[in-house]
Amino acid sequence: MALRGIPRLASLPTAIGNWAEQLDKAAPGVLTWLQDFFASVFREFKDLRSRVGALESASVATTNTTTYTSTGAFTHTWSANAVGAWVTVVAGGGGGVGQASGAGGGGGGGSGQIVGPVWFDRNSASTTSGSVGVGGTGAASPSATAGGNSTFGNLTAVGGETTTGGTGGVGGAPSGITAPTGGTSGAAGGNGSNCAAIGAWSTSGAAGGGGGTANAGGNGGVSPTGQPGGTGGTGNGTQGGGGGGGGGWDGPGGAGGNGAATFPNTPTAPTAKGAGGGGAGETSGGAGVGANGAPGIVVVQEVLE
């Protein structure tokens, strides 16, 4: 019986000798078939090797990343062979608040909106304008400010909000979108709401925690990148802690200040991009001052051809 063109061997050689001669006698023509078969295999491997070599030498897409961290306007100059870029836009975080003596801990600031990474087509442009949003100013109520917007071309991320009392600031979100709500003020401050998805490539900022009127302040909400909000400051049963700021792009929000009979009750100004500032803890010695929110960032990862 033949198997795919190989004749059945009538009798196999049993002693070492001229195997080729014995095999040819046992199955006439099989040597020629084997030679043709292995020659074909060799040709296929040779062709495969040349194809792999061609793939290895072929050019692949490379990237060129530029990061903008200085607040204010900038101009991005495209690389000559860039076709577009993956862009991430992070807005500034809102400043935390301090309240008057006896009013409780201040609310933490909300973190800035995050847009991207999203594909931005170059469309033959030589430059594209953008801006990095400032962090909001932490202050005694009602003087704290919201974080600034960040932009790149037609992309805009909205800054996190501040507050005027013990309630945490809302997370940054565009007009018409319900932003995550700040934690409520109470004996113990409520936690700020986590970020919320806006679309396939955009997410709101996280809200700040509420200040406590006697006990701990609430934590800030979790950011789109999974960063935790700042922890609320501790209270002492009389003076409440400040609320934590909303979580940022690359780190946590600012921690709230601790409630205390005397100063300091200083909250934390975060370093994470777009994070909200912590709210001041309550004291009997005067109004507290909230911490600044963190500025935003714009990352442009060009794809080159």
Model-identified regions with their sequence ranges:
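Short Lys/Arg-enriched alpha/beta "domain-start" segment
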Residues: G237-G242
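Short beta-strand/loop motifs in extracellular/secreted proteins, especially
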Residues: V83-A85
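Glycine-rich strand-loop-strand elements at beta-sheet edges
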Residues: T67-S79, V89-N154, G246-N265, G276-V300
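Secretome/extracellular-domain signature
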Residues: G96-G104, G109-G230
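Bulky hydrophobic/aromatic "packing anchor" residues in well-ordered structure
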Residues: A157, K273-G274
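Ser/Thr/Pro-rich, low-complexity mucin-like regions
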Residues: E302-E305
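Glycine-rich, low-complexity segments
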Residues: A39-S70, G211, V222
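Extracellular "spike/adhesin" assembly and maturation modules
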Residues: M1-R49
